[in-house]
Amino acid sequence: MTNLTLDVNIIDFPSIPVAMLPHRCSPELLNYSVAKFIMWRKETGLSPVNQSQTFGVAWDDPATTAPEAFRFDICGSVSEPIPDNRYGVSNGELTGGRYAVARHVGELDDISHTVWGIIRHWLPASGEKMRKAPILFHYTNLAEGVTEQRLETDVYVPLA
């Protein structure tokens, strides 16, 4: 179940260096890319899930984008540059700036309700404008044993 009311805050988000794995195909295959990123994390220890932040960078809406054109980046914060590797994980940076942030609680399949709640309801009422940049998802409680219903994901909508 998703949030019934949104508690939205405006924050200044700092730029964050990340290890990034681009996903450039059908959203239905995203879990394969996520599994690849997890394998890279475990093998290298460079962005351990229990010490690093985990992000998704949503360039496109899967509901309105052709599967072959869909873009999503899987990211983990890092404290040093990462070397070339066989997984295709590279150095990247999450763009800083002003963002509207709301917490989504529950299954990731329902996260669009929170995204659209910010964009369609909160944004017009706030007088803020959306900046042309991707939406960020910060997965705040990824851990073994956390059920999908208890996942907490902060949704970051870029503001002008």
Curated annotation (Swiss-Prot):
Keywords linked to the UniProt accession: Repressor, Transcription, Transcription regulation
Membrane-spanning segments: none
GO biological process: negative regulation of DNA-templated transcription
Keyword Transcription recorded: yes
Superkingdom as given in the UniProt entry: Bacteria
Cited function: Represses expression of mcbR.
Record protein name field: Probable transcriptional regulator YgiV
